[in-house]
Structure formats: C-alpha cells, structure tokens
Amino acid sequence: MAERVLTRVHRLRERVDATLCAHRNEILLFLSRIESHGKGILKPHELLAEFDAIRQDDKDKLNEHAFEELLKSTQEAIVLPPWVALAIRLRPGVWEYVRVNVNALVVEELSVPEYLQFKEELVDGASNGNFVLELDFEPFTASFPKPTLTKSIGNGVEFLNRHLSAKMFHDKESMAPLLEFLRAHHYKGKTMMLNDRIHNSNTLQNVLRKAEEYLIMLPPETPFFEFEHKFQEIGLEKGWGDTAERVLEMVCMLLDLLEAPDSCTLEKFLGRIPMVFNVVILSPHGYFAQENVLGYPDTGGQVVYILDQVPALEREMLKRIKEQGLDIIPRILIVTRLLPDAVGTTCGQRLEKVYGTEHSHILRVPFGTEKGIVRKWISRFEVWPYMETFIEDVAKEISAELQAKPDLIIGNYSEGNLAASLLAHKLGVTQCTIAHALEKTKYPDSDIYWKKFDEKYHFSSQFTADLIAMNHTDFIITSTFQEIAGSKDTVGQYESHMAFTMPGLYRVVHGINVFDPKFNIVSPGADINLYFPYSESEKRLTAFHPEIDELLYSDVENDEHLCVLKDRTKPILFTMARLDRVKNLTGLVEWYAKNPRLRGLVNLVVVGGDRRKESKDLEEQAEMKKMYELIETHNLNGQFRWISSQMNRVRNGELYRYIADTKGAFVQPAFYEAFGLTVVEAMTCGLPTFATNHGGPAEIIVHGKSGFHIDPYHGEQAADLLADFFEKCKKEPSHWETISTGGLKRIQEKYTWQIYSERLLTLAAVYGFWKHVSKLDRLEIRRYLEMFYALKYRKMAEAVPLAAE
C-alpha cells in the first residue's frame, strides 16, 4: 500500500517537473501571475482564471503535459512568495501536495503535516513553534478493512458484510463471536434467540438441524407459541419468528451462513435479529416542536426530517417485532432542549406525543447552569458550554422514561452528534451519526482563519465536536454521496475533515477517511400524507385555497406579506427556506431583479424570514436589510411577493401544488445544501425544480430530465436558464409536464421514508454486530478521544460565553 502511494506522488512531482523542464518560460509566466496575488489562498476558479488569461499558444504548450487538467484537480494554492504550494485532489478522498519555488523553479513533494505547516505560515509566519499538537486517527483504523474504489464510498455496510462473511465463518472457532452475540440478546430480563443449553457452535448446528427437520413438518402459518416450549428445551428462545415459516427461514439462513457464508445472507440474517426496541434521537438546538416553529431561528429542515423519520421508523420497528414473534412495545424518544420561554410553541412542555405514532414522544430537557435553568433560545453556535450537563440530565430522564437502556442512539447536527457520542460512551450503546450539514464547508477558510470567525460562530468548538463525533460513532448516515466525498470537481463535507489546520489549536493530519465502511448513504423522503402530486385532484386540500390565494395575491401589504403581484396570469417562480446567508434567498431575488426577460415571464414569490417579529439572529437581520434594499433599488413591487415563514406543513404541501397549478417552478438557490428536503418536497408535488449544484440536490436531480442544476456563484447564468425554461414552456406546454413527470419518477425510485427506515434498522443490526466483534479494537480510539475531549475540547467549550438571561 505504501509503495503504491509513494509511486503516485513521484509521478505527480515528475509530471510538474516535466512541464517545468519543457516549458520554463510559459510556466514561469503562469506561476508569476499566481505569485503576484501575494500571500494568501487561491481557489480553483481563481487558478483557472489566471490560466485562461495567458496566451493561447502558451496554454497549448503547457497542455502538452496536461497542465490544465492538473490545475482543475487543484483545490487550493497557498502563495507565500517565492513559494506556491498546491493541494491536488486526484480523485475523491485521494490527495497529494507539492510546492514550487517560482524563482528557482524547483518542485518539492510535501507530506500532509508539511503542507499544513506551510499553510499555517499564512497566519503565524514562520514562527509556529517546534511542536504542534497533531491529531491523527489513522493508526487506530489501520487494521480495519476498507474499500479503495470510489464507487464503494457510502456503501460501507455492503463492504462490511463481505468482510464479515469472509472472516467470521471460515472455521469453528471463528463462529464464536456470532454464538456469543446471539446468546447476549436479552430485553428487560427476558432471554431471546439462544438460552444456556447451547454452549458451543457444534451444539448450535445440531440444534438448528433438529429445528429444521421439525419445522418442515409444520403448516407454514403455525404460530410460534405452539412450539415455543419444545424449542426452549433444545435451546431456542423467542425472536426467530412469529410463524413456523419465518422461524424456518431464519434457521435455514443461519445454517447456510455456517456452511457457506455470503454477504447478502449475513445482512438479511442480522437484519432480522431482534435488536432495536428503544431508540433515542438527539436534536438539542432550535425550537423543536410539531407546530408553529418552522422558520424560527435554527429551525428548519432538520426538524422536518426527524418528524418524518420517526413515524416511518416506528412502523418498521412494529412490523419487525411482530414478525420476530415478540410482544415488546418499542419506544422512540426525540430528545431536545426544553425552552421555558416557549414563545407560543410547545417547546416548554416536557413530553409530547409525536403525531402519527403510538409509542414515540418528544422529551425535552432544559439547559442548566449553576444559576439554574436557561430560559431563552440560544443560537446553535453557542450551545457548547451546556452540553456536558445537558447529557447528564438526559441520561437520567431517558432511564426514567424507558426503564431500560436505549438500543440505538442517533445524533443530529454537530451538538446532537457530540451529545450522542457522550451518551453512547456512557451507556455502551450503538451510535449513529447524521450531520445534516458540517459548517466547515459552508464558510470557506473557516479553519485556517478560525480566529476571525470564533467570536461569532465558535467554530473551534464546533469543528472539534464534529471530529470527536465522526470518529466515535459506529456508523454514519448521509443523504448523498456528495456529503461524504463531493463530486469530480467539489470536495465533500466529510472529505474536508481529512486534513486541515486551526493554527494555535491543533493540526489534523488524518481526521476521517471517506473510504471508512462506517459511511452509508440512506436518503430520506417526503411525508406522503402531506406531499403528493398536484394532479391527484381527489386528495387536494382545496379548503386551503382561499388562504393560499390571499397569501399570494392579496393587495394588502402587512407583516405577513410584502409587495403585490399585479399579473395573476404569469407562472410563479417559488422558493421557501430560512433567511440566512447560505440559503441565498436574497441572491435569487437579485438574479431575478437584474434579468428583464425572467421578470417578464414569471412572478417571484419568496417565503423566508419572519417579519412579524424582530429577529434575534444576526444573519437573518442582515439578509432582511438586503431584501428591503433590493425591493427598493430594482422596483420589484408588482412582480415580487415576500411572504414571512410559513409554519403549517399541511398547508405548505398544498402551496407547492397551488404553485404547480400556475405552471410555475421551485428554486433552491443555496450556496451549499447538504441534502435538500424542500427539493424532494417540491418534486414530490410535481413542481419542476431548479436547485443548487453544490451539495445534495446535484444528486437528487438528473439535469434536464427530472429538474435542473444551477450554480449559485453564477447568478446571471442561473437566471438565463430559468428564463429559457419558461420561454420553452410557453412555446411547448408539454415541456413543463415532461420535467414535472421526470421529477415524480425520480422521487418514487429513490426517496421514500419506507426505504429509509428499512435500511436504518438493518444498519443498526449489522453495526451492532460489528461493535460486538470488534470491541477490543475500538477501545484504543475511544481512549484517544477521551483524552482529546478532556484536554482540548472542554477548554474550548468553557471559553464560549454563557447566554445572558
């Protein structure tokens, strides 16, 4: 392995060397242009712009050695005259580093620590000390199996199953972990699967053969209780199935595994073992409630995701428990923060049943300090000093509520994942991580220049919490491949944590490996009760139409809607999101305002921000100010409608369909979107959708077939693409239908909550088994994380100011 990497590095250096030797003048001219920018960081588009600026014949000479291709793979250039260092991404998850002395035209290869040390000179100069704390998780995972192909990224469970089936069942001794695993299954004192009559693998195989012979003779629908006592006598307990047919399937699967193991059978068998009865889902920040909260600060897609996830998850748990022949009632607890100042929501209520479920609740636990309970909302960027005490309180609350340990803990976002890590560590429970969004990719250079951001965002605490959580967890769920490893041209959210530096704090030389089999892509869907095609007229919620009509077309301007639409015959271009910088709603308004063709074709309706009350969120305040300026500067009144955030999800579903009735379209213009739940919602309603090509929507939409990609950094082109679409629809009305139908088909194939919940519970089973068989291997990394948490993270969190009451 080491030899292959070394060879690749030399080839890369030799490639640059060859270009230098063959075309010294041309390369000197180009590098001089780069160097002339002075000390700093150049991004890919800046490097390519400089390359485009040189003469065509010089470009042609350099391209004899594929120099432009090399530049396209370069994610950043560090300029410290006379040196220029390049971070070159050969493919997702595979990086190399070189630097060139512009004066001497000498090329040097750099290791990860050398490159990061060079980069730190941008901040610290050359005096960054002889010893810097380096964080390196690679030694702890070196012995773990990992795939090497890009296509394997995000399919961790498939790789793990192949590895386990090959390694765990090759002789009698290797079957011992499975035997121990099956014997370890208990629930509140009740034994499941195997009892103490089965001592070794030989006994197990003999018992399974006897069971097979017996079950074959029974009618398939025979209930388990009719032969329960007979099975107990030979060592088999409840959990194999509810009927003779299902029990026989399980017995045969295990016999097949012991005889000739294969990955598909292993996954199916593990997925049917009774393992998950109590689930805790952590989502502390924002206003977490089921009504009247969407659009509040830090309250958006993540809340919707969890409230859609939980009913589907409960349904799948109930189905599996029944088919396992058990009479256990599952519980799901969504643990969030209790807000005494609940501002008209249920966020001050300790326990709240989740709509559409029987056994799932929101459990709220307050943040506390030595002075008592914290009453007011706190930004997600300022929660860090409260988390440790919060988790101590949460552990007591869930123990009292469940009367048992949870079987699976799911974290959401940075602080939820840190909380999940602390709780899973304390209880010894399988942990699942869902990032939703890793902030480091949203704010360019927020690692190297962390001090500029820290007073407002406290990224030093957040990035550290992210590193701890992603390395502590048993498995990670992402909605898209891009979330893990980006695309050919863009770096993935997790990939950006492979190597980075925060000067003065620590240097990450190996933070995460995107090839790690803990990564799995499991995409969510939209709630089919709320979001369904506009064409399903019998299901349409027409009672909302007068309200929606007033919302869109009323001549009244007030706190809920500003500006009016004069021409009701035009289609509506629609967007709905939080009003913050990254969501880029004001960017969309500016594109529209500056494109006369688009303004002539459609009305623009923006739902975002809450003008009904004064915002406490600084970003929202800035975006509101910008929106007012755009309306006035470009005289948008008459073609534009700005509606305050809408919190009624049922009505919002009909709003999408109402927009579809106008033959309009939905736009998601974010600078970055981890997944894009509103994209899925709009497409599920049959609304043609245009969405950012930075993040998840690039995978959800197949460009030109089920929607369109737009580049938020090139607003003029995005506006032209929108105008082209509506012009074509005007000439060919069937074009609108084609894109609408393409979007619906895409959703039905890939983005449903049923597929999601089945996959999640199977992952919990497989990684629960992996956790059992590799517990000794995981101990070292957990000790390392304990030390890093205690000595580094805790001090950073304590430095975050407590909120003023």
Curated annotation (Swiss-Prot):
GO terms, molecular function: sucrose synthase activity
EC class, as a word, reads transferase
Q: List the SUPFAM superfamilies.
A: UDP-Glycosyltransferase/glycogen phosphorylase
Provide the alphabetized UniProt keywords.
Answer: Glycosyltransferase, Transferase
- Enumerate the residue ranges of region (GT-B glycosyltransferase): 275-752
- Which reaction(s) does the protein catalyse, per the Swiss-Prot or TrEMBL entry? an NDP-alpha-D-glucose + D-fructose = a ribonucleoside 5'-diphosphate + sucrose + H(+)
| Pfam families (UniProt xref) | Glycos_transf_1, GT-B_Sucrose_synth, SUS_EPBD, SUS_N
Q: List the disulfide bonds.
A: none
Q: What does this protein do?
A: Sucrose-cleaving enzyme that provides UDP-glucose and fructose for various metabolic pathways.
Give the protein family: Belongs to the glycosyltransferase 1 family. Plant sucrose synthase subfamily.
Which PANTHER family does the annotation name?
PTHR45839, SUCROSE SYNTHASE
The entry's protein name is: Sucrose synthase
- Origin organism is Solanum lycopersicum (Tomato)
